UniProtKB/Swiss-Prot annotation:
Gene, per the UniProt record: ASNS
GO cellular component, one term: cytosol
Species, as recorded: Bos taurus (Bovine)
Keywords: Acetylation, Amino-acid biosynthesis, Asparagine biosynthesis, ATP-binding, Glutamine amidotransferase, Ligase, Nucleotide-binding, Phosphoprotein
Top-level taxonomy: Eukaryota, Metazoa, Chordata, Craniata, Vertebrata
Pathway it works in: Amino-acid biosynthesis; L-asparagine biosynthesis; L-asparagine from L-aspartate (L-Gln route): step 1/1
Domain of life, per lineage: Eukaryota
This protein's name: Asparagine synthetase [glutamine-hydrolyzing]
Sites bearing Phosphothreonine, chain numbering: 545
Length: 561
């Protein structure tokens, strides 16, 4: 995890513009570099480094002697870089995984390059010989990327929007900033004056398609067919490999552990892989909650079962409320469920950075979208409709769960790794018949649970534990985080404000006082940027007016039991 920033065709003093690059310093606490592009006085790169691989020669922009005309600034991890290096016999100058991008580009161009990358990435590649600029982002947008471009060809790119909003440009007093679409790359012409012109935007990978790099990843051969035992075996192989490839780091590895199915499977598989790799330190797992939190109890059971060095972080309602402003600033969104769920993750990331030496943190993000884990999937009218909804959620991950996971950890200089969003694992899961993936017997993620039924990876009671939303599970069933927030915000936003909400906030007008409160904070930090969020996250096929899972029938029944 790092922070990347670049300008092309700036008409303002670069030393002044560079101040904006410091807005993302949290993403790379180990080092910073600002570098002008030779021959283009109005083009530059900024890079904040979190040293995870090749601590000696890993600074960016990456430049190697063989390609003096190529400049690369990227944020990500390319897990198959060594396999590709050996297969194509590339001569590396560094040990940095991102160097593979330069070699692949020289060999086969930009399209082949992005299709070959197994990992998560956001990059800016400059080719001064052919006068081209390329931008690219991974399939699910696990690594963030924002851009701003004016009609006269000024281009600004950054890992987070906050690094662009204060940039100055003579032609545009208000610079439009927007997220770069996941799963795409863009080709731009570089003009002699340093300005650019967009040539094409290309989708390089759909989540359902088996990626091109599968030809080179070395995973043992999968069994053909959709018999249940065959499918379960293939899923175990792919998930095991998804975790194993993500061990690539020179820093200590830890794991978030909520005690839910997803994080528990990740933690248990991770610990097994660390032992096989003969890593000499114990795996640290981390859980957060208030007193009587069901997550804390469940996480403790999993940690005892797998034998991790477990850390429990307690917080109270006041501490959670106090960080709402910081959280919304970090997130760059006012989406209600994203803000709620981010408080716990923000606080536990802060604890990890301050109290441990774990830097690379594994987590279970992406599973709910991929495996139809949300409670409302029980209401899907058909397996085909459930499949459509699952793919929609995956396409929008970069706006919600992936955004939350990246910003809350990056705010504290941590790097997050998400095995459930592995290309091979996710594309195989999505290739399965729709009726195999839906909830069964009143239990969501039935296929995933059944896959690990006989593995003894995690306790049976955890394997079959019902879905618990992170923002709800960190508090007690009787007094959820949802209810705590409502009680507090009721006194912060009056009825008169709600009555005029549509006039004040015409885009995504808040319908609740909680939504209004978050929107006010967002507008204080990012005025006029409401269009970053196309719509609020809400469950489908239900008349719920709030995204909290606790408001759904499934939970109301559980609370009374």
């Amino acid at each position: 995890m790092c922070g990347i920033w670049a300008l092309f065709g700036s008409d303002d003093c670069l030393s002044v513009q560079c101040l904006s690059a410091m807005k993302i310093a949290h993403r790379g606490p180990d080092a910073f570099r600002f570098e002008n592009v030779n021959g283009y006085t109005n083009c530059c790169f900024g890079f904040h480094r979190l040293a995870v691989v090749d601590q000696l020669f890993g600074m960016q922009p990456i430049r190697v002697k063989k390609y003096p005309y190529l400049w690369l600034c990227y944020n990500g991890e390319i897990y198959n870089h060594k396999k590709l290096q050996h297969h194509f016999e590339f001569e590396y100058q560094t040990k940095v995984d991102g160097e593979i991008i330069l070699h692949l580009y020289d060999k086969g161009g930009i399209e082949q390059t992005v299709c070959m990358l197994d990992g998560v990435f956001a990059f800016i590649l400059l080719d001064t010989a052919n006068k081209k600029v390329f931008l690219g982002r991974d399939t699910y947008g696990v690594r963030p990327l924002f851009k701003a471009m004016t009609e006269d060809g000024f281009l600004a790119v950054c890992s987070e929007a906050k690094g662009l909003v204060n940039l100055k440009h003579s032609m545009t007093p208000f610079l439009k900033v927007e997220p770069f679409l996941p799963g795409h790359y863009e080709v731009l012409d570089l003009k002699p004056n340093g300005k650019v012109a967009s040539v094409e935007m290309v989708k390089h990978h759909h989540c359902r398609d088996e990626p091109l790099h599968a030809l080179y990843d070395g995973v043992e051969k999968l069994f053909p067919g959709f018999e249940i035992e065959t499918v379960k075996s293939n899923l175990r192989i792919l998930f095991d490999n998804a975790v194993k490839k993500r061990l690539m780091t020179d820093r200590r590895i830890g794991c978030l552990l909520s005690g839910g199915l997803d994080s528990s499977l990740v933690a248990a598989t991770l610990l097994k892989q660390l032992k096989e790799a003969q890593v000499q330190y114990p795996l640290q797992t981390f859980a957060i909650g208030m007193e009587d939190s069901p997550d804390l109890l469940a996480a403790r059971k999993v940690a005892n079962h797998i034998g991790s060095e477990h850390h429990e972080v307690l917080f109270n309602s006041e501490e959670g409320i106090q960080v709402l402003d910081e959280v919304i600033f970090s997130l760059e969104t006012y989406d209600i469920t994203t803000v709620r769920a981010s408080v716990g993750m923000y606080l536990i990331s802060k604890y990890i950075r301050k109290n441990t030496d774990s830097v690379v943190i594994f987590s279970g993000e992406g599973s709910d979208e991929l495996t139809q884990g949300y409670i409302y999937f029980h209401k899907a009218p058909s397996p085909e409709k459930a499949e459509e909804e699952s793919e929609r959620l995956l396409r929008e991950l970069y706006l919600f769960d992936v955004l939350r996971a990246d910003r809350t950890t990056a705010a504290h200089g941590l790097e997050l790794r998400v095995p459930f969003l592995d290309h091979r694992f996710s594309s195989y899961y999505l290739s399965l018949p729709p009726d195999m993936r839906v909830p069964k017997n009143g239990i969501e993620k039935h296929l995933l649970r059944e896959t690990f039924e006989d593995s003894n990876l995690i306790p049976k009671e955890i394997l079959w534990r019902p879905k618990e939303a992170f923002s709800d599970g960190i508090t007690s069933v009787k007094n959820s985080w949802f209810r705590i927030l409502q009680d507090y915000i009721e006194h912060q936003v009056d009825d008169a404000a709600m009555a005029s909400a549509a006039q004040k906030f015409p885009i995504n007008t808040p319908k609740t006082k909680e939504g209004y409160y978050y929107r006010q904070i967002f507008e204080n930090h990012y005025p006029g940027r409401a269009d970053w969020l196309p719509h609020y996250w809400m469950p489908r096929w239900t008349n719920a007016t709030d995204p909290s899972a606790r408001t759904l029938t499934h939970y109301k029944a559980a609370a009374k039991a």
